């Protein structure tokens, strides 16, 4: 049983080493038709996170 766990550990270490040394794609292919209206960054849209409104809701629930 000890030998099996050592072999599994060695395989995991080797695969992790190979994964860490893998080179990322230099120029990944762009999306075929990206949506210009899609906003991937929620912080870029000021209406996406209404922190003041959230604080008011939490305060009203606590009182």
Swiss-Prot record:
Q: What's the chief localization of this chain? A: secreted
Q: Where in the cell is it found?
A: Secreted; Target cell membrane
Can you say where the AXPX repeats lie in this chain? 22-25, 26-29, 32-35, 40-43, 44-47
Signal sequence bounds = 1-22
A biological process term (GO) from this entry: defense response to fungus
- Per the UniProt entry, the propeptide covers 23-48
**Summary of the tissues where the protein is detected:** Expressed by the venom gland.
Q: Name a single GO cellular component.
A: membrane
Q: Does the keyword Magnesium apply?
A: no
For whether the record's keyword set contains Nucleotide-binding, the answer is: no
Q: Name one GO molecular function term.
A: toxin activity
Keyword terms, alphabetized:
Amidation, Antibiotic, Antimicrobial, Cytolysis, Fungicide, Immunity, Innate immunity, Membrane, Repeat, Secreted, Signal, Target cell membrane, Target membrane, Toxin, Transmembrane
Function summary: Antimicrobial peptide with activities against the fungi B.cinerea (MIC=5 uM) and C.albicans (MIC=100 uM), the Gram-negative bacterium E.coli (MIC=25 uM) and the Gram-positive bacterium S.aureus (MIC=100 uM). Shows cytolytic activity against insect cell lines. Has no hemolytic activity against human erythrocytes. In vivo, peptide injection in the vicinity of the head and thorax of lepidopteran larvae induces feeding disorder followed by death due to starvation.
Q: Which family does it belong to?
A: Belongs to the MCD family. Eumenitin subfamily.
Know the name of this protein?
Eumenitin VP1
Q: Which organism is it from?
A: Eumenes pomiformis (Potter wasp)
């Amino acid at each position: 049983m000890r030998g099996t766990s050592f072999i599994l550990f060695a395989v995991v270490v080797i695969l992790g080493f190979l994964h860490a040394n893998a080179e990322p794609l230099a120029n990944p292919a762009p999306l075929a038709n990206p949506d210009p209206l899609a906003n991937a960054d929620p912080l870029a849209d000021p209406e996406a996170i209404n922190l003041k409104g959230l604080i008011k809701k939490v305060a009203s629930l606590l009182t």
